[in-house]
Amino acid sequence: MAAGAPAAGARRGGSEAICNLVICNDSSLRSQPIIFNPDFFVEKLRHEKPEVFTELVVSNITRLIDLPGAELAQLMGEEDPKLPGANSTASGFFRSLMSLKRKEKGVVFGSPLTEEGIAQVSQLIEYLHKNLRAEGLFRVPGNSIRQQILKDALNSGTDIDLDSGEFHSNDVATLLKMFLGELPEPLLTHKHFHAHLKIADLTLFDEKGNKTSTPDKERQIEALQLLFLILPAPNRSLLKLLLDLLYQTAKKQDKNKMSAHNLALMFAPHILWPRNVTANDLQENITKLNNGVTFMIKHSQKLFKAPAYIRECARLHYLGSRAHTSKDDLDLLTSPGSKELQPLKSQKRSRLDSCHQEETQQRTEEALRELFRHVHNMPDSAKKKKLIRQFNKHPSALTPSSDVATPPAPRRARSRSFSGLIKRKVLGTPVIQERKSRDSTPEPKRVSKENVHLLQKCGSPAHMSQGKLKSLEGQKEESCRRMRAHLLSKDSSSL
């Protein structure tokens, strides 16, 4: 799917519901775009559990507008809608009967709305998107002969090349209105008629709590969002395509001279007025209905998004308990490549959590390294030994990282090396290699500092006697023991 075409599926007629899609090309996601539908759980609940979904939406509609028992039952589909006009019910019955006959013949015009009909009409909408600058669009009638040719072609399902120049934009615009006007019921349905009248009455309140004449746009948008959620799927799909077309047309009113209000006057009788009623039947409601359609055109870009609380309720319905997880959901979670197709919000949250954990771990390691340096540089004391013992109790948590290497323990001078040096200096005899020591300390490559000082005190080896040599060896052994004990204590300190 290409970015920037969220309604492409609906224009082709291949989708059953409007999907608001967000396409992300985040480089951290292996350069694979992720398509995320924020209303996924809303549409899932709508298709899998329509009764639960309808009850959820209608309960929130009644919170915004006051619907008496009869009108609420009509909205829920429990009663037939009672519409203005004495013969509205009977004429509606015969009109529905005629539409069924037309549907059997595969006729698009005059038949109930289907995906096939939307696919045919979407050709007209796409063509009009390219010709929005025509002055008087949707107001100036086209040529009736060309319109009949185009209508027959749509009913027969033949391919039409609207860009060939054979048809004018006014022909196509008039035919689109004709299609909407010949539907068995208006695009916004009869059972929603009274709800739209109540939405038009939503106004702001003053400081004293009294109603004013200023429309409450936020509540009206919220009510329309909810009402559009319970429209039949084909009606909702075509309504979105139509309102988007009218919105784009009104944006070019400096060229086509068609404002949102002018467009509402053209389309309100086709998409909102009940069938077979006159202006006298509607009386004072005509202004409300026209203003309502004007409001829909101006705010069409906001009306097909589910309110945030509906999204949250639908999400909790499926994710709040493992018992709600279906087999299809489990297959989706375990399918190959599901990690790359996780919702964008979940991946973003996981990335933020991992970054936060890395920052916290980095700060902890820096603090531990600083503490380790401080303790290591302390002079030998009881306090230092106590801290070292505490370090030894938790080696994994308090061991500094590899960039701060533990200073190596100084190598101990071996007594055999010093003894061999004395014998070579005094006796001039070769030294026999002694057996290897049990400990793993390797032979030092140089004489320790203390042994060098001791050797310098001995004077010339040529004048040294055997007794003096034994005395020096005894001193050497004692010095080695002290030095070995001192080095052992330093080894423990370094650990």
UniProtKB/Swiss-Prot annotation:
GO terms for biological process: regulation of small GTPase mediated signal transduction; signal transduction. It comes from the Eukaryota. GO terms for molecular function: GTPase activator activity. The keyword Ribosomal protein does not apply. The keyword Ion transport does not apply. InterPro entries: ARHGAP19_RhoGAP (IPR047941), Rho_GTPase_activation_prot (IPR008936), RhoGAP_dom (IPR000198). Keywords: GTPase activation. Gene3D superfamilies: Rho GTPase activation protein (1.10.555.10). One of its GO terms (cellular component) is cytoplasm. This is Rho GTPase-activating protein 19.
